[in-house]
Amino acid sequence: MPNNATLVVAGDFRTDEAKRYISEYFGSIPKGADIARNYPKEDPITESKEVNWGDPNIQLPAYLFSYRVPGQSERDSYVLSMISNYLSGGKSSVLYKKLVDDEKKALQVQAVNLGLENYGVFAFFAIPMGSTSKDVLQKDIDAEVKKLQTTLISDEDFQKLQNVAENNFVNSNSSVEGIASSLATYHVLYGNANLINKEIDIYRSITKEEIRDVAKKYLNPNQRVIINYVPEKK
């Protein structure tokens, strides 16, 4: 339906000609009914919850520690994206180096900020190595989060995060297709297509103190849901 769609034209074109083609190809499509967007409001998570999910098709367990965080248009969501990069963005990141490379406690570990329109999810995902227990992985992940909450990251690590943010932004907008995709995303999910000109400045303005404070605000044990995804006998 036209009233639930976004059309982006990017590249070298004449505006009057583009409008004529848009009208020619899409103008006859009728408008649909009005769309009600009444999203439920969720109560804050104030105590830890744990659930088990068995799957007969897997051989190794996986553990998910997830937290509800702000929607992707909020400034704190940008900070959480930098936190996820610091903790697990690449083989030199804190959690990968500690749990996978050095201590061989995990086959895989990730920290992901999944930005969504209203609320987001920040989640740690870990697959244990050998007999490593969930409690051990949870303790080690919590310890790294605690460091973030109480100690400012180094200038070197902070500069790396800034470099990653700039590199990701440039790469995603280095082609006409990428620019069109970004414009659509910013308009539909953020309500502001002009973020294509301003989002990088948001990342550049984030401070080490904000990283500490946002970790302290959202990544606490009483604010999470733990999912144990475990093998189940057939």
Kindly give the residue locations of the regions a language model identified.
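Non-catalytic beta-strand/loop surface segments
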Residues: 1-3, 28-74, 85-136, 157, ...
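Non-catalytic, conformational "gating/processing" segments within enzyme and secreted inhibitor domains
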Residues: 1-25, 223
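A common structural junction motif
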Residues: 25-33, 103, 142-153
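Zinc-dependent metallopeptidase catalytic helix centered on the HExxH motif
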Residues: 77-78
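Acidic/histidine-rich, surface-exposed loop or edge segments in extracytoplasmic proteins
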Residues: 192-197
